[in-house]
Curated annotation (Swiss-Prot):
Its EC number is 6.3.1.5. The gene is nadE. Catalyzes the ATP-dependent amidation of deamido-NAD to form NAD. Uses ammonia as a nitrogen source. Gene3D superfamilies: HUPs (3.40.50.620). This is NH(3)-dependent NAD(+) synthetase. It comes from Mycoplasma genitalium (strain ATCC 33530 / DSM 19775 / NCTC 10195 / G37) (Mycoplasmoides genitalium).
Length: 248
């Protein structure tokens, strides 16, 4: 834990310096009621103070637990937050596109993530803030995020932290138990949880990535398949290798 707290302080100093050099006023991020966004919020508040951090709580068919978790987070942690109702915008968009969220729930879920991204960047530009992502090392390694959705950010503070490290920081910051004990979820569709969707637990993934666990052939296939499907998420848009001579 001592090394983790040392890393945290180095991270906070780096964040502060980077934002200052960027001539931004502060940082903005989505607050979902999950443990990753809660830890990012705690880091942001401690680093930049109340006025220069902003948590957007974006409502799109959120669960009752989402409401309870975000409410308790804001009340206990005293985050600077704004509630944004996006449900009407989401419903209008999927209707315009002819998408039924109950049938094509994955497409609809990714639209939710991208609508939140649009909202974050609109507020970021309005207030001269930089956008903080909430993804951890496991999610980035497997590509478990929505391209141009929750994967879009200016700074990814948790990018080198395992899920177990995020839990340790949550304890360090005294994050409410309702957040720590709930099943990790991106809240993309009803009943969705990260571990059910991936087919493997964060504990297994943490141990595997540290080299402390040899996965079964079935679990190895899950990890390799997830990484292969998400490879494009880690790359810039592909360009045709043959250069066009535009001078002729």
């Amino acid at each position: 834990m001592t090394n983790l707290i040392k890393y945290l302080k180095e991270l906070q100093n780096w964040l502060f310096d980077y934002v200052k050099k960027s001539k931004a006023k502060g940082v903005i991020f989505g607050l979902s009621g999950g443990i990753d966004s809660a830890v990012v919020a705690a880091i942001a508040k401690e680093t930049f103070g109340f006025e220069n951090h902003l948590a957007l709580i974006m409502h799109i068919n959120n669960s009752k637990l989402d409401f309870q978790a975000t409410s308790e987070l804001v009340k206990k942690m005293q985050f600077n937050s704004i509630n944004i109702e996006l449900e009407e915008s989401f419903n209008l968009l999927v209707k315009t596109l002819g998408i039924d969220p109950k049938k094509d729930f994955l497409t609809a879920g990714n639209i939710k993530a991208r609508l939140r991204m649009i909202t974050l960047y609109a507020y970021a530009q309005k207030h001269n803030f930089l956008v903080l992502g909430t993804g951890n090392f496991v999610e980035y390694t497997l590509g478990y995020f929505t391209k141009w959705g929750d994967g879009a950010c200016d700074i990814a503070p948790l990018a080198w932290l395992l899920k177990e490290d995020v839990y340790k920081l949550a304890k360090h910051f005294n994050i409410p138990e309702i957040v720590i004990t709930r099943a990790p979820t991106a809240s993309l569709f009803e009943g969705q949880t990260d571990e059910t969707e991936m087919g493997i637990t964060y504990k297994e993934l943490d141990q595997y990535l540290k080299g402390d666990l040899i996965l079964s052939s079935e679990k190895q296939k899950i990890v390799l398949d997830l990484k292969a499907k998400a490879e494009h998420k880690h790359n810039s848009p592909l360009k045709f290798k043959h250069l066009y001579n535009f001078q002729n």
